[in-house]
């Protein structure tokens, strides 16, 4: 007895068993490969009989095929099936295609004319394909970086650090490893292929790199094909300009030597001009010596008059002082929390990479958020917090923050800043397997978008984060190039509530003009948003509710909206006629709440046990 003619379903079951058995943490990538192969197998249109037919499926290689073949052999032995014989349909199909294709027939005739030695070997030498790196890959960036630095046979070599600093802008991947996120390989590994193909030379200690003649030609063609323009101050451009200048000098010299009489006339004109200029200089000197002692020379008004400073308009509204900054009176700066690092070994990664892209940054401790855009006045140096703030998370850090309720607390503090554009940036790199928390992350991200009105930005790694920050900085600079700022200088901000209330009050009054934006000065934001052990009664009430297992910040806020104080909650419990009514009080009150803010029966009972049974 033989297996069905289309054993695709059977092979899919075997492949699923392989996935289920690969559960350890170090097999995470294997599981991804097998899942991809399983998806391709289920969607493969043609029948599959013999294990070798699996090689036609995208994502299934020799190793996976061997595993499935062993499982099929065991299955056949246990169930009394005969192991399938390899069919010749593939060979027949291939020969039919060769016969019907005239180009293939021609190839066969050519091979018959080759010497008998090649026929006896049965193989034909394959022509070596010319190596050309993929666009925006590691090798692509290295070639263009060396070309821009002028590191070729006629120039000097450069170190790895110098090369990476320039090559990074031409590559989408990082040239640095990051073992903390399992990034054990980097784009720098492409240097091996470049050396193997004689495009790059490595020499000396420490290693220095330069282009070969073939590498220079390839790099130049890549530059031309992709319309890349190097910086004017680069070695490549300076060398190019120097060559053009020398060519123009050579051409001028050639023109003069062709016509000797013209050259003599040119020389006579130069002599006469120099003589006239000397005479004018002597006359001017003589005239200046005749100036009397009491006569003072006139001084240019442009030099003596100091440039007036631009005045800052100041005012007071409802007892709160403010300043008005014109659009051209301030610069935009990206401020990064100094605790935001790529890894322990590379703490200045973000500031360094952004500076290479021409983005001005500052770094210090932020009391809220990880990155914020500030406006800095050109004369006073005073700073104010703009309406754009970023909270950055890696996937593993996101999972931990959700589990320990830090995620909800951070969102609450970000909302208290009053920023209109709050970005939650998630880097899809992780130090361990987080696939078991996928549903939890999806739920948290969706609630953040829908209920908190945050922007979610997903990036592949730290390098794509830098690129996104660069793009955002340019957009924000363009946006604020036409905006005036009303900077609030509140003297008595004692808590976050006053900070947010005053900001909303100013926005209502001043932002009726779309060309004006209101914001607090940076010092006020830092002092108002600092974490403190001193809590208001409202915050203490929320903390008490959140001490009950299962009560998130969203649920606590929903309870507080129905029962504003702890006293009103206790009175509501005491008004219940029976104990059963008290146990389901919160459940019934919040039955119309959104999904993540509803209180179930058991949780309502727990709340009564904690607070209502007093």
From Swiss-Prot:
Domain ERCC4: 333-430
Residue stretches of biased makeup (Basic residues): 123-132
Region (Disordered): 80-132
Compartments (UniProt record): Nucleus
InterPro entries (alphabetical): DNA_pol_lamdba_lyase_dom_sf, EME1/EME2_C, ERCC4_domain, Mus81, Restrct_endonuc-II-like, WH-like_DNA-bd_sf, WH_MUS81, XPF_nuclease_Mus81
EC number(s) reported in the record: 3.1.22.-
Key words of the record: DNA damage, DNA recombination, DNA repair, Endonuclease, Hydrolase, Magnesium, Meiosis, Metal-binding, Nuclease, Nucleus
GO cellular component term, pick one: Holliday junction resolvase complex
BP-aspect Gene Ontology terms: DNA catabolic process; double-strand break repair via break-induced replication; mitotic intra-S DNA damage checkpoint signaling; resolution of meiotic recombination intermediates
Pfam families in alphabetical order: EME1-MUS81_C, ERCC4, MUS81-like_WH
Family matches, as Gene3D superfamilies: 3.40.50.10130, Crossover junction endonuclease EME1, DNA-binding domain, DNA polymerase beta, N-terminal domain-like, Winged helix-like DNA-binding domain superfamily/Winged helix DNA-binding domain
Cofactor(s) the protein requires to work: Mg(2+)
Molecular-function annotations in GO: 3'-flap endonuclease activity; crossover junction DNA endonuclease activity; DNA binding; metal ion binding
Subunit structure: Interacts with EME1.
Function: Interacts with EME1 to form a DNA structure-specific endonuclease with substrate preference for branched DNA structures with a 5'-end at the branch nick. Typical substrates include 3'-flap structures, D-loops, replication forks and nicked Holliday junctions. May be required in mitosis for the processing of stalled or collapsed replication fork intermediates. May be required in meiosis for the repair of meiosis-specific double strand breaks subsequent to single-end invasion (SEI).
Protein family per UniProt: Belongs to the XPF family.
Name of this chain's protein: Crossover junction endonuclease MUS81
């Amino acid at each position: 007895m033989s297996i069905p003619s289309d054993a695709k379903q059977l092979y899919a079951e075997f492949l699923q068993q392989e996935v289920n058995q690969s559960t350890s943490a170090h097999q995470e990538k294997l599981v991804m490969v097998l899942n991809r192969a399983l998806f391709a197998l289920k969607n493969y249109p043609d029948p599959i009989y013999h294990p070798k037919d699996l090689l036609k499926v995208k994502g299934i290689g020799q190793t996976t095929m061997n595993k499935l073949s062993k499982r099929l052999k065991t299955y056949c032995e246990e169930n009394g099936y005969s192991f399938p014989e390899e069919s010749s349909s593939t060979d027949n199909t291939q020969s039919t295609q060769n016969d019907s294709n005239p180009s293939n027939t021609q190839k066969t005739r050519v091979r018959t004319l080759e010497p008998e030695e090649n026929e006896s070997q049965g193989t034909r030498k394959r022509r070596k394909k010319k190596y050309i790196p993929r666009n925006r890959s590691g090798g692509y960036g290295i070639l263009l970086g060396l070309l821009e630095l002028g590191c070729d046979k006629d120039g000097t070599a450069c170190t790895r650090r110098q090369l990476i600093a320039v090559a990074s802008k031409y590559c989408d991947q990082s040239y640095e490893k990051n073992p903390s996120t399992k990034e054990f390989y980097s784009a720098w590994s492409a240097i091996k292929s470049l050396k193997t193909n004689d495009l790059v030379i490595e020499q000396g200690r420490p290693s220095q790199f330069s282009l070969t003649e073939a590498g220079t030609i390839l790099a130049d063609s890549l530059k031309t094909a992709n319309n890349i323009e190097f910086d004017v101050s680069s070695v490549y451009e300076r060398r190019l300009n120097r060559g053009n200048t020398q060519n123009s000098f050579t051409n001028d010299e050639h023109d003069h030597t062709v016509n000797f009489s013209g050259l003599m006339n040119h020389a006579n004109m130069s002599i006469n001009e120099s003589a006239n200029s000397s005479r004018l200089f002597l006359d001017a000197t003589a005239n200046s010596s005749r100036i009397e002692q009491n006569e003072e020379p006139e001084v240019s008004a442009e030099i003596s008059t100091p440039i007036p400073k631009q005045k800052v308009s100041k005012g007071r509204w409802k007892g709160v002082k403010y300043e008005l900054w014109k659009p051209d009176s301030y610069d935009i700066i990206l401020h990064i929390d100094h605790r935001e690092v790529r890894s322990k070994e590379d703490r200045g990664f973000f500031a360094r990479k952004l500076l290479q892209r021409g983005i001005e940054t500052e770094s210090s401790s932020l009391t809220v958020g990880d990155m914020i855009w500030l406006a800095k006045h050109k004369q006073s140096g005073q700073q104010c917090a703009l309406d754009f703030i970023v909270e950055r998370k890696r996937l593993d850090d996101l999972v931990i923050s959700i589990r320990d309720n830090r995620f909800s607390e951070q969102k609450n503090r970000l909302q208290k800043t009053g920023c209109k554009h709050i970005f939650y940036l998630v880097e899809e790199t992780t130090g361990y397997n987080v696939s078991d928390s996928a549903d939890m992350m999806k739920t948290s991200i969706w609630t953040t978008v829908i209920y908190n009105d945050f922007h979610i930005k997903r990036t592949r790694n730290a390098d794509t984060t830098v690129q996104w920050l660069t793009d955002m900085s340019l957009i924000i600079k363009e946006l604020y190039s036409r905006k005036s700022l009303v900077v609030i200088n509140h003297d008595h901000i004692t808590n976050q509530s006053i900070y947010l209330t005053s900001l909303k009050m100013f926005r209502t009054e001043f932002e009726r003009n779309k060309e004006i934006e209101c914001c607090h000065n940076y010092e006020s934001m830092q002092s108002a948003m600092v974490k403190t052990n001193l809590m208001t009664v409202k915050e203490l009430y929320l903390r008490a509710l959140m001490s009950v297992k299962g009560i998130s910040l969203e649920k606590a806020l929903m309870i507080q909206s129905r029962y504003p104080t702890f006293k009103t909650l206790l009175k509501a419990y005491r008004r219940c006629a029976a104990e059963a009514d008290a146990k389901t009080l919160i459940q019934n009150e919040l039955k119309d709440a959104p999904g993540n803010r509803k209180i179930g029966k058991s949780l309502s009972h727990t709340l009564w046990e904690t607070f209502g049974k007093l």
